[in-house]
Structure formats: structure tokens, C-alpha cells
Amino acid sequence: MKLMTMPSEFQKALPILTKIKEAGYEAYFVGGSVRDVLLERPIHDVDIATSSYPEETKAIFNRTVDVGIEHGTVLVLENGGEYEITTFRTEDIYVDYRRPSQVSFVRSLEEDLKRRDFTVNALALDENGQVIDKFRGLIDLKQKRLRAVGKAEERFEEDALRIMRGFRFAASLDFDIEAITFEAMRSHSPLLEKISVERSFTEFDKLLMAPHWRKGISAMIACQAYDYLPGLKQQEAGLNHLIVSLKDNFTFSDYHQAWAYVMISLAIEDPKSFLKAWKTSNDFQRYVTKLIALYRIRQERSFEKLDIYQYGKKMASLVEDLRKAQSLSVDMDRINTLDQALVIHDKHDIVLNGSHLIKDFGMKSGPQLGLMLEKVELAIVEGRLDNDFTTIEAFVREELAT
């Protein structure tokens, strides 16, 4: 198969391939970018594979950076762009089902492609637009099928994260997993416990944000892979609820919303501990935990002005999106009205602060001062007090007198 026209991302990188070939080596576009071009999807990263060894690659170009030279990767700075160029390689026995014990550089494109995970990711493209397909990846693309390169059992024994990648690709590409590949994923799912939580989180996160995330979750359920992921053991019912409780065409607005609804569906009692098990950042834990709290408030009643002030318009909108996807009542107009009615959106918007209370009223720093500032803040938010210096001073005097 030959492309009639090269996408602009590849055209810009063609001089890189040309330079390498003029130096006497082979060079090809490889991986996900080739797959995405053939599927008419946006290209995110342009990866280049070559028969030149790292030091040979560095000798060809003036500006290079060693970003992973032990694995054969050199970053080339050329034509206003940055390109990762990786030497063809083979990999020895994997240790801990995660990483190869040794990487060996080779001159053969086929040897390099056979170590990849799925046939649709094992395609290469030369400078003339000719697709090199050693493992029937083009047929799998046409039939929307995800199939492991070579022996599926070996691919997942080498790196068990490929199981999570399989779920993610099913979700992002809307592909079905080929039967032998699926069975190998199922039988090797216990190996996911060997994978770092951070790597699994990245794949699960991408799955949740994919347009066909239900397909990925369904495959995960069918493989019983969830039993080997943090906080998901024996959560088949919760994951099924996640799939069926939202409208078929619903996709998550952002990953905070996605993870919040995962925990809502699973009826997680301690969201922070659940997210800690996934080794997420403290900021992520705080935001998602607040989002769940606001969701539960909304289950009980309509939003009030204080809710919008404390949680923000964006978070309230994420909650309403989830309610709409469940065919529950929504009121975006109310959110907008309440937000517009807020005199302040943050305590720093208040014209009087703690320094003024210490200076003008002789208050001391401590709990009493903090409590007074909270009273002022609440009164302004609820509309009982104008955000005016003189008015606030009068309010404080009255409070101190009681």
C-alpha cells in the first residue's frame, strides 16, 4: 500500500529520513503515527526508526540530545522540530514482566517491528509513502481488529502493561480484540500486579478519556483484569454500573470527572484512599474528592450560592454533565445565575483583610481572627453584606460587641 499524499507532519520530517538514507542507512516512520494516518486520525508524535546506531545517528546531525541512548533513542533538533530517532533493536528476556534485561541494536527493520505489541502498531512508512507491513497489520486495520504481533502469550509475558494498552486501544480506536490475543490477555492479567501503579494509571486514564471507553471497560471486565488493579478487586458490578448508568453517547469532559464517576459507580467510601492507592498527586486527590462531595450535595438538593462560591462554576458544571448523562434533572441556568450573583469569587477579593482587623480593631492573629474573617466572607457571599470597607468595618464592630 502506498499513500497518495504525505500528511504535513511527515512532510516536515522527510528531510530527516533523507539525511539518514544519504548517510547509507535505512529510516522509516513507525508506530502509532503511521497507524493514525491510515485511520485518518490526528497525528500526535512522529517517531522514526533507523538502522543507524546511536553514535552513527549523532554523527549525521549537528544538534542532538541523548534522551534514551541506552535504548537506542536520540533526540534530533532539525528544521525547527524535535524528532526522536531510535535504532532498530531486539530485546532479551524481560525481567519482572516489565523491562528487557538487555537491548541489542540490529540493522533489520523486521527484527525491530516483531518486538512491538499489536500488528496495527507494527507498521512502517518510507520516504515515498510506501507502507511496510510485515505482520498483516493493514488487514487488521481494515477489519478494526487488535491482534498481538507473533505469539500473544510472549508479548504479554514480556510486558504485562500491554494488556492495559490493549484495553486502551480498544477504547480509543473502537477495535475488537482478536480471540487468541484476548485469551492471552485474560490468562496473563494477574501479571498486572507486577506493573508499576503509575504506568497502569496512565493507561486507565487514557482509556477513560477515549471516545469508546465502554468498549475498553467491557474488555477489562471480560478479562477479569480489574481484580489486579488498585481498589478494583471484586468490583465487576460497579464497573458494569459505570457502563450502563450513562447515556451511550456520553464521553467524559476531563479526567477529574471520569475518575470521580468511577468512584461514584463503585460506591467508594473513601475516595482519597482509593486515589492514593493509584499514586495520584495530592492536587488531583483534592479536586476529585471535592467533585464527588459536590455531586452528593446535588443529589440531595439544588445548588445554592455558597456551593458555587466554595466549589466553583466549572466543578458544578461537571456535576450537571454527569446528571444529564444519567437523565436526571439539570439546571445550568441556575449555576450561571448564581455565579453572576456572586460579589466575590475568592476571599482575596474582600476589600478588608486580617491586617486591617489587627491594626484597626486590635485583634490578635489566631482562631478568633480567622473566625471573624470567615463571618465576613460568608455574609458577603450570602448577600447580607456589601464588599465595602466602611460597611465591613461596621459589621465587625457589631460582631465584636455581641
UniProtKB/Swiss-Prot annotation:
Chain positions recorded as CTP binding sites: G32, R35, R116, D159, R162, R165, R168
MF term (GO), any: CCA tRNA nucleotidyltransferase activity
Cofactor(s) listed: Mg(2+)
Single GO biological process annotation from the record: RNA repair
Keywords: ATP-binding, Magnesium, Metal-binding, Nucleotide-binding, Nucleotidyltransferase, RNA repair, RNA-binding, Transferase, tRNA processing
Residues bound to Mg(2+): D45, D47
Domain of life: Bacteria
Catalytic activity: a tRNA precursor + 2 CTP + ATP = a tRNA with a 3' CCA end + 3 diphosphate; a tRNA with a 3' CCA end + 2 CTP + ATP = a tRNA with a 3' CCACCA end + 3 diphosphate
Enzyme Commission code: 2.7.7.72
EC class (word): transferase
Positions bound to ATP: G32, R35, R116, D159, R162, R165, R168
Family in the record: Belongs to the tRNA nucleotidyltransferase/poly(A) polymerase family. Bacterial CCA-adding enzyme type 3 subfamily.
Subunit structure: Homodimer.
Function recorded in the entry: Catalyzes the addition and repair of the essential 3'-terminal CCA sequence in tRNAs without using a nucleic acid template. Adds these three nucleotides in the order of C, C, and A to the tRNA nucleotide-73, using CTP and ATP as substrates and producing inorganic pyrophosphate. tRNA 3'-terminal CCA addition is required both for tRNA processing and repair. Also involved in tRNA surveillance by mediating tandem CCA addition to generate a CCACCA at the 3' terminus of unstable tRNAs. While stable tRNAs receive only 3'-terminal CCA, unstable tRNAs are marked with CCACCA and rapidly degraded.
More details: A single active site specifically recognizes both ATP and CTP and is responsible for their addition.
HAMAP family: CCA_bact_type3
Protein name: CCA-adding enzyme
Taxonomic source organism: Streptococcus pyogenes serotype M1
Name of the gene: cca
